[in-house]
Amino acid sequence: MKGKYRGCDIEVERCGAEFLTFAVFDNGYEVTSGFSDSSDTVRDYFSYMNSVVDDYKEHPEDYE
């Protein structure tokens, strides 16, 4: 699933039954990326990534 939130590009995908991969980009800059051993749905994890973007926008120094 790909989308935009507060100007950032968010990507969340399910890789097999066990893992979710995720990435957040702001103007081509990778804010965060990785994987999670989660049973959450892609849509639920995408919503969680919105809170990560909110934190990044409030505290960009924490993501340098």
Segments and roles (model prediction):
Residues 10-12, 24, 53:
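Hydrophobic aliphatic residue packing
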Residues 1-18:
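Short N-terminal "domain-start" leader segments
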Residues 14-31:
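Short aromatic-glycine-(Arg/Gly/Cys) micro-motifs in beta-strand/loop hairpins
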Residues 29-64:
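Mixed-charge, Lys/Arg-enriched low-complexity segments
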